[in-house]
UniProtKB/Swiss-Prot annotation:
This is UDP-N-acetylmuramate--L-alanine ligase. Its main location: cytoplasm. The keyword Cell division applies. It is an enzyme of class 6 (ligase). Its EC number is 6.3.2.8. GO terms for molecular function: ATP binding; UDP-N-acetylmuramate-L-alanine ligase activity. Belongs to the MurCDEF family. InterPro entries: Mur-like_cat_sf, Mur_ligase_C, Mur_ligase_C_dom_sf, Mur_ligase_cen, Mur_ligase_N, MurCDEF_pg_biosynth, UDP-N-AcMur_Ala_ligase_MurC. Cell wall formation. The keyword ATP-binding applies. One of its GO terms (biological process) is cell wall organization. It comes from the Bacteria.
Amino acid sequence: MPRLLDRQTPVHFIGVGGIGMSALARILVDRGHSVSGSDPRDNATTQQLKTLGVKVFRQQDATCIDAVTGRTAADSPVVVISTAIPESNPELQRARQQGLEIWHRSDLLAALIEQQPSIAVAGSHGKTTTSTLITTLLLEADQDPTAVIGGIVPSLGSNGHSGQGKLLVAEADESDGSLVKFSPSLGVITNLELDHTDHYSCLDDLISTLQRFAGGCDRVLANHDCPILQEHFQPTAWWSNQSDESVDFAALPLSLDGDRCVARFYEAGQPVGDFTLPMAGLHNLSNATGALAACRMEGLPFNQLVEGLAGLKAPGRRFDLRGTWKGRHIVDDYAHHPSEVQATLEMARLMVRSGRSPLPSAPQRLLAVFQPHRYSRTRQFLDGFAKALQNCDLLLLAPVYPAGEQPLQGISSNALADRVRKLKPDLEIAVAENLDQLTELVIQHSLENDLVLAMGAGDVNGLWSRLTS
């Protein structure tokens, strides 16, 4: 690993447009590396990378490697891949033929983490939001951290930033188990729940992986409100939103509205002060409490952190108001697990019920648009999705986003609709055959002042652009 970090080695990313890969590419550019990459997608991310001087190839084949390989080993790039790149990828095969040094994305992130004091955020849900909030609080406190985040940090306008401060903040993705390579100064674990069943055969496998991650951290901060963490982990410090007893940090809600949370912060059972979080939902209060606790463990004064809370915003695709179309409020959210869908719908329902929201006007109805992600995942969580999706006034379902998987017999959005109907027969549900039809269904069924909430990790986030075009 030292060759990449100690010398100005060129670096080539296969799949540079991915949210995790592009963050690392940005940081290496900031640090003076010559960076190139390939990605068949031409999107805002690849366009931004080009403006930074990154050479981006639209194809993924041997010619990309030939174009960036130097005459000597010192002139040749380190090639970075992610778990999404298969061994059959022709670009990767060419790199191996050329004898180039190949790193997994997690190896590069591990090397960056080892370089400086770092905070790595892990867990099944809330990683991106919590790491974004930590980054934002540090920025507001003039700490200027380096950040490697799985979403766009609003205060940075980017997912990657090479700061001048001493700290690095990273999102530690558990989906492929590679987070066990990380050795941060402080590990933050938001919660644990079975997910990524393509990698983990059971919950015990996931617990074991996170225990290995925790073992590599100098200190660990964990969410006491998660029963699985309570049972299987012994962190340095706990946080809670349920009680200030037997925990190191707590934020107990004083009021919850559709546009904010007001809470009292405790340390070691003693009240420290009240704060207002300009975000709705108990899950966001939990994320913010973890972020505050992490910053307190790094020695930042509470009063300074509270000042930074005023301008907090969630990362991109986390209840992201895209705009208002013909009086309909179009919101995009990355929720693609039953617990995430439930929390997001509860937050949206609170906005409708309370009449208070960050939207331009108070929404009258909640129209949920959901795109299941992967056939295997839909099969695993079919009942959980059905239960979560009841909490809306109208439900529109997009086809399953395959993410490279082949269809499974009996697993479809129609099957999900049938499960929801059994639980809530009077709920109006429509299933689209494609995204064009989904857009037409939104146009036909939505009314002025509806909150149209599009959820999923696939391409359902294109709903806004389809409506406005």
